[in-house]
Amino acid sequence: MSIISSWLLVSIICLTTSIVTKLQAAGVTTHLFYLTRGAPLSLKENYYPWLKAGSFFPDALYSCAPSNKDWSDFAEFTHWPNFLMIAVSYWQQKYGQNDRLRGTHGSLALKSFLIGVFTHQIVDVSWHSLVTDYRMHGLLRVLSETEFDGDIETAHTFLDVMGEFLTLNNVIRDSNNNENWDFLTRSDWKLPREEDLMEIIRNAGLSKEKLSYAELEFCVKRGMAAAISEGYLFRSQRNQLLTNIYSTSPRANDLILNHWLGGQSNLVAMLQRCVPFFETLFHDENTNEAQAEELRLCANLPPVSQKRINARPLVSSLKARKGNSHIVVSPMKSFSDFGTSLTMGKFREDNKDYLAVSAPLEDTVGAIYIVPWDILTVARKEDFSILQPITAMYGSKVGTYKASDVDYLLVSQPGTCTIDFYFKGVKILTIKDETTEEAHQLQFAVTGNFYDDKIPDLVVSSPSYGANETGIATFIPGSSIISYLTNSDKYQVVDISTFKGVINLDGYPMKIPFQHFGATIQISDTTDKQKLIYITCQSLGTVFVYSSNDLHDLSIPIYYITKNGVIPAKDSDHVEWHIIPSKEHGMFGAAIYSWNFEGMSFVAVSQPMFDTVFIYIEKSGQIEFFLKLVLKIKTKSDSIPDEFGSSLLFNDEEKKLYVSSPGSFDARGSIWKISMDELLKAGNDPKRKTLLINNLRHLMLINPDKSSKGVSNFGNSMILGPQNHLIVGIPQYGYGNFDHMQLTGRILVL
């Protein structure tokens, strides 16, 4: 069904169920959701009705009377910090300067309402790509360019309308989740006292004659009615709505969750940083221009991580709980995303094994937990809680750089385009990129030995790099890095451009705006001197393959791999390259994994939006299609992906390929395993080039936690630890919690 048909369905159902309106309500549920992420716990218990009304207030007058220019102009004004400065100034004069009134119901109701308004302002700027100097990079812009052929209006409507139902789907896994349903559909919105709110509105320039309290209350309550209607509509038509959404844009939900500017991780970090500052304005006796400027910054920032953070050693509580055949480890701390990225290494002086776990949301700047592997032996016998060292930083991805039998911990800070090296817990080197103002989201991708000198080379990349997000992959020779590591008595900061032998690939000869070259990178696991380098150009739905023997800035791929086959470079002139939407490419190349089995080099390329993994075999620098894995499990809708192939891992000891599917089983998530014997048998059969993956034969594990609310992203990351233990990241555990323990994250050790 087309996107227009989908919206028509929404309109018809709205009319037949007496819903007040459709388009005026766009975003109301989204703003309620972000309110739960940003509102202070101290106000949530008793003042949610005023918080909710405030979170919709800036949009209330836009469509209540579309022909009323005074109302629409005032609505625009309420979207910006000057309105809040006027409102806080009123609150200070009325309540703040009187200790007897400061804690009264009227005071706290007005404060809660204004906090709701502030959360709305923060979300709108990034969500709708309004950030100054970053308008080409926000969520709406990228969705428009990659999914809707640059049609910003269609993308805007899709985001505002269908984004509501994606948000509902993410926080409510099934119809029995009554607590969240009640919050979203409760008729409890309230405005502050009439004398307070109308005086603020008059001070902001709209007279009593142009807007009455009754009119304003009516317009705000329309938002409440719309939120209730959206909830009931989704509850009754969930499967049909999601089928329409995923048929139109399979990757939209991933962008809403994870996009670096306007995605939920970005917005939650901003809310967690900015709302506490806004609260301080209620403690000061007077508001000033410096505070107004800080508010403007909070509502107009690129990711919070853009602020450079100095790493500092801390300790934090870590809890482990044993299950039947697994161990669960978590910091039990809201807004952490613990488990986003994992790596093993000997990272401390005792030369023992440690697990490094990133928690990129923690304290709005992120943290890396360094977990001794020994404690997991204790956890197999009893539950425990201990204090563990962590390093405060923005660490969305961690890795291990092994040189001369020494393990260095790599930590990416994409907001500052820096990669840090840690030796025995001490930061000794930072690699940064200041070659251009359009360097965005650069981070560690992979290590490999391209020059046969036994020194690992480093690859960093970013699909968002450049003014038009064309993307980049940068290769830094290990021989240029090693001297900085061996002279580790002094911390050094080095710009990428100063290293000798650096190679920058940008997808040449293709350079199409928003092609997102460098989304995923993998190096073939082969004993051959010539290694193949696989780089995903995500919005072209293509994996570019380069030879390590011919690597320079203007290198041309020797192969292009798409879902339809392997294209040698000599045949690529016949291909018309252009941006294609995810409903066609299915996120082909979202994950790439290479392994060697009995002298044969295999490469798996996932297509998680179509629940498919393609397997190729390398032979003397040649690539051949070998087998396709397709997940087939009975679900309510085949259009809603199980995200099979989100993460890939080969277990040498078991001789099995592990594949995660975070969206399976009502988004609980699962891990599947396929033996090499079965892969080889199916791949070598000329009549059978597809292997169907099913519950009976291939299901290894369903997320054992049945009670969690919302999506958890189970299996977002997987690695093997000592003694062949599988470690599974569950970074969004607690996603559906609206008050305590939101987005704590956890890991599972099998």
Curated annotation (Swiss-Prot):
Keywords assigned by UniProt, alphabetized: Membrane, Transmembrane, Transmembrane helix
Organism: Saccharomyces cerevisiae (strain ATCC 204508 / S288c) (Baker's yeast)
Topology in the lipid bilayer: Multi-pass membrane protein
PANTHER family linked: GLYCOSYLPHOSPHATIDYLINOSITOL PHOSPHOLIPASE D, PHOSPHATIDYLINOSITOL-GLYCAN-SPECIFIC PHOSPHOLIPASE D
Regions that span the bilayer: 1-21, 465-485, 586-606
Main location: membrane
GO CC term (a single one): extracellular matrix
Protein known as: Uncharacterized protein YJL132W
Subcellular location(s) per record: Membrane
UniProt GO molecular function: glycosylphosphatidylinositol phospholipase D activity
